[in-house]
Every structure is written in structure tokens, then in C-alpha cells.
């Protein structure tokens, strides 16, 4: 193609456009028909160049609307929303759930740095606001005991150290959110001879009153601080207060029911009365031999806090939940659910009853309050005692059944008339 000026190119394209507008014969004059013939003669070369430059297929291929919008095939959507996959996902084997949870839990977590309380106290002492003379007895933070039932006094763990002249006692204010340590002055130190070996020290008697007086006068507090019993770390034992309260309640209950005073020796054993500290136990049977204790812990810790979980022997596991509701949810979730291809048979031990895997309806019956069962326990234990059972009066039975007394029955005989 020879070099053409811009004017000639515009002129040629204009004549080609005029020829396209007047395609129909018989319309227009001689010029239009001559223009058509002239354009038809020169048409093949132009159409070739037009197809090379402006091919409609190339434009459609480059700017396809489906490619821009990212439209997916309908079959892929159907596969994603298929109900069969949803059903399979809900009833999947528990082993698949464990494996997926392990893959998610492989992200490394930064270990928490647990600082010792003694280091914190030493940092406080080094600050300029602290006292110049370091105190001899140090106080650790008050422990949060989760396994006690409303103990009136809270235990504080204080290690005691020997001192030739005396010892310094720190008072812990448990009523404030942040524990403040108050040191008494050296003039008011209580001199107690302490041997070089550590010993148990209990603040009782006049020492308690003296300590409350010192705390109210020196620390100028509106209310006397509760003094706690100071024991050694290794010698700490849980209080036995709740069991005694429970036995007292049972004795009073049995006396009101029987109207007879019974010695506490004849009470039924306290084993069926389950305290909330014991937790709710659930046994899992029909397990695959390759199921380990870690699998049991990982499987049931999702439902709630576990008190303990162990594998009794291959095929049988025992799980104890802290809360009763968590045990019920775990029973509903995992009962008759497959683990490694075998359905788990869960037995729930609640309030002395055992709900097996074939009796899920007993969950509703066992949700009744346990106070009724506690009141029924002495009633069951009374016939087993040495007292003979009370004699039943037949008149009372007749009154209850027929709403009439025995005397009326004897005085008024029944007449029968028989017709033959």
C-alpha cells in the first residue's frame, strides 16, 4: 500500500461510506449508482485491510464480559451447595473433626511468661517509694480456690522465715481489686520466738484482737480486715466444712420426717449425695482400640471444662465434667456418634441415676432438683435401721380406700338379693 496523505484517506473513506448508505437500487440518481459501481470495484482490497485491523472476534475475545465479571459455571455452584455434602458434613466421623482441629491448632503460640510473685515484690521494694528496710515475711498473692463452697474465711499462703529478734507481719486487704501490702512500724512489731525451722503459725485468741486493733489504728481503716489463717504451702488442706453442714442438714431432715431422734451413726452413707465439686461423670463404651486418652480429651474439651478424662482400658473411657450442663451437651452430641467407624455408647451418671445410651428420654426426668432426692434418702434408709416398721391400722386403710371406717362396715352388713 502506497503512502497516502491524510486528506486522500479521508476522501476515500467518505466515498465508501456514501456507497454503503445507498445500497438499494432505484433510489438516488446516476451519481449514486456510479458511486456504487466504483466502490464495488475497489471493495476486495479494502475489506481485507478492514478485517486485518478491526476483527470483531478479536475484540470480543479480549473484552469478554464473562471474563470481567468472573462468572462461574453453574455446575460448580451446584456442587458447592449440594445437600448430600451438607448431610455428610454434619454426620462426619469424629476422627475427621479431630484431624481438622489438629491442623488448625498447628499455629505456634507464644508461651506466656509467668512471673514469680517474689520477683514482683522485689521490684516493688527496689522502687524509691518502698521502705528502706526490707520486710522479713513476704506475702504471695491470694490464691483463687475454685473447689471450695462458700468458705467464710479465705486462705492466704505466707511463708515464714526465722529472725533472731522478731518477725514482721503483713496484712492483706482482700476487699480491694489490687492487693495492697501494708507493713507495720518497727515499734509495733509483735515479737514471737520462732525456731530456725519453719513451723505452722495460726493467729488465734488474743493475737487476733491485737492484730485487728493494730490494723484499725495504724492503717486508719473504717472496717476491720478479715484475718486469715496462716499455714505453710505444703501443709494446706481443703476445709471440711461443707460435709459437716450437709450431714447436719440430713440429720434434721430425717428427724422431721420420722419424728424420732436417731443417732448420726444410723444415717445412710454420704456417697449418693453428690456435691458440685465431684462433677458429672460420663462413661464412653464401644471405642475403637486405637483411640487414645489424648483423643478423648480433645474430643470432649469442646463441650466444656473437664475435671478429668482417662482411658480406663482399651474401649472404655471415663470423662468428668465440671458443670452438669456441659455433660448433658456432650451426651447429646456424641452419643451413638461414630469414632473410627464405631458408634460411641455414652452413659451419664447424674444424681445417682445412670442414663444409658438407649435412654435419652431420662435426661428430662433427671433434671428435677436434687433436694427431693436428698429428702428421700433418709426415708429409704429408715427401714434398714434397727427400729421396727410401724404397724398399719386396718381402719385407716379402709378409710383411705372406701371413705368409710371399719366400724361402719361391721355394723352395716351388705344385703344380697338373688332371684332364681
From Swiss-Prot:
PROSITE patterns, per database record: RRM (PS50102)
Subunit organization: Interacts with POLD2. Interacts with NCBP1 and EIF4A3. Associates with the multiprotein exon junction complex (EJC). Interacts with RPS6KB1 (activated). Interacts with ERH. Interacts with THOC2, DDX39B and ZC3H11A; the interactions are ATP-dependent and indicative for an association with the TREX complex.
Protein name, UniProt field: Polymerase delta-interacting protein 3
Any GO MF annotation of the entry: protein-containing complex binding
Modified residues (Phosphoserine): 5, 127, 215, 217, 244, 275, 385
Record has DNA repair as a keyword: no
Compositional bias of kind Basic and acidic residues: 370-379
Chain residue ranges for the region called Disordered: 256-277, 369-394
Domain RRM: 280-351
Compartments where found: Nucleus; Nucleus speckle; Cytoplasm
Cross-link Glycyl lysine isopeptide (Lys-Gly) (interchain with G-Cter in SUMO2): where in chain: 200, 223, 248, 372, 417
Positions carrying N-acetylalanine: 2
Positions carrying Omega-N-methylarginine: 33
Keyword presence, Acetylation: yes
Protein role: Is involved in regulation of translation. Is preferentially associated with CBC-bound spliced mRNA-protein complexes during the pioneer round of mRNA translation. Contributes to enhanced translational efficiency of spliced over nonspliced mRNAs. Recruits activated ribosomal protein S6 kinase beta-1 I/RPS6KB1 to newly synthesized mRNA. Involved in nuclear mRNA export; probably mediated by association with the TREX complex.
BP GO terms, sorted: poly(A)+ mRNA export from nucleus; positive regulation of translation
Organism this protein belongs to: Mus musculus (Mouse)
GO annotation, cellular component aspect: cytoplasmic ribonucleoprotein granule; nuclear speck
Phosphothreonine, modified sites: 140
Keyword field: Acetylation, Cytoplasm, Isopeptide bond, Methylation, mRNA transport, Nucleus, Phosphoprotein, RNA-binding, Translation regulation, Transport, Ubl conjugation
